[in-house]
Structure formats: structure tokens, C-alpha cells
């Protein structure tokens, strides 16, 4: 299914998934980067923080961006800074998140992004294993 913008131009694709775990796994596999827009739901924040965590762990090396329109994410960014000041977040991990007040500036910063933080574990050390009888992504799905 494709989403059409008011202009009628196709701007994306809608994927129906069974739960949040599958949603995040699909995004992580297929996205070239992650951008958090202004969100009114906790899921936006949860997904954002998980992608930041996965970057820190070395699960992915993709850019994580915040579209910080009108300072919407200022308190979150200040929270990260406080975490560094208090020793709960390593200084280099702050570089995982790229933020800007406009889409154009955010895209420019994201294109220049190079991971500079130290990973807790190498990307190769992460393996996907089944959790009980829970099906893995793309397993047992009709073609």
C-alpha cells in the first residue's frame, strides 16, 4: 500500500506488522537512517531511544536524527547532556544523535554524520535467536 501526499505524489509505503517488536525490527533492517519527528505518542520516544541504544550497542551504524522544530526536543537533549555530566552516559555517546530545527539542516547534518562513539559490542556479535515460540521476522508469513 502506498501513501499519497496531497499532491498525489507517492511519498512512502505502509507496512502492516503484528506488533511493536516487528515494527522496530523491520525499520532497523530496511531504514538507511532514523528520524524522530514531533510525536504525540510514547511510541515515538520509545522507538527513538531504542534506535539510540542499538547504535550505542553496535547493532547498527545508522544516523539517528531529531527534527527539533521550535525546540520540541530541547528538554530531551538537555536530559542527555545531564546524563553525560552525571556520568550515566559516556561523552562519545552524545554524538549518536543529530538534531536540527529544520528538515533541510537535519538532512545536511545527517549526510555528514560518521559514527564516532565506541560501541559496547561489535555489530558481528549480535545474533537473532528465537525467543520461545515467537516467530522471527518474515518467518511463516504468506508470500
From Swiss-Prot:
GO BP of this protein: cytokinin biosynthetic process
InterPro entries: LOG_fam
GO molecular function, one term: cytokinin riboside 5'-monophosphate phosphoribohydrolase activity
Pfam families linked: Lysine_decarbox
Binding residue positions for substrate: 23-24, 41-47, 53
Keyword vocabulary terms for this entry: Cytokinin biosynthesis, Hydrolase
Catalytic activity as recorded in UniProt: N(6)-(dimethylallyl)adenosine 5'-phosphate + H2O = N(6)-dimethylallyladenine + D-ribose 5-phosphate; 9-ribosyl-trans-zeatin 5'-phosphate + H2O = trans-zeatin + D-ribose 5-phosphate
GO CC annotations, alphabetized: cytosol; nucleus
Its EC number(s): 3.2.2.n1
Stated family: Belongs to the LOG family.
Function as written in the Swiss-Prot or TrEMBL entry: Cytokinin-activating enzyme working in the direct activation pathway. Phosphoribohydrolase that converts inactive cytokinin nucleotides to the biologically active free-base forms.
Protein's recorded name: Putative cytokinin riboside 5'-monophosphate phosphoribohydrolase LOG9
Organism: Arabidopsis thaliana
Highest classification ranks of the organism: Eukaryota, Viridiplantae, Streptophyta, Embryophyta, Tracheophyta
Amino acid at each position: 500500500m502506498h501513501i499519497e501526499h496531497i499532491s498525489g505524489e507517492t511519498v512512502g509505503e505502509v507496512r502492516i506488522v503484528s506488533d511493536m517488536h516487528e515494527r522496530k525490527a523491520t525499520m532497523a533492517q530496511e531504514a538507511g537512517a532514523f528520524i524522530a519527528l514531533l510525536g504525540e505518542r510514547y511510541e515515538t520516544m520509545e522507538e527513538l531511544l531504542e534506535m539510540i541504544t542499538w547504535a550505542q550497542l553496535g547493532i547498527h551504524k545508522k544516523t539517528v536524527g531529531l527534527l527539533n522544530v521550535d525546540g520540541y526536543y530541547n528538554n530531551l537533549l538537555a536530559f542527555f547532556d545531564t546524563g553525560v555530566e552525571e556520568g550515566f552516559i559516556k561523552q562519545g555517546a552524545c554524538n549518536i544523535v543529530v538534531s536540527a530545527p529544520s528538515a533541510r539542516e537535519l538532512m545536511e547534518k545527517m549526510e555528514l554524520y560518521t559514527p564516532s562513539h565506541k560501541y559496547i559490542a561489535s555489530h558481528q556479535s549480535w545474533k537473532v535467536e528465537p525467543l520461545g515460540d515467537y516467530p522471527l521476522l518474515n518467518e511463516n508469513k504468506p508470500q
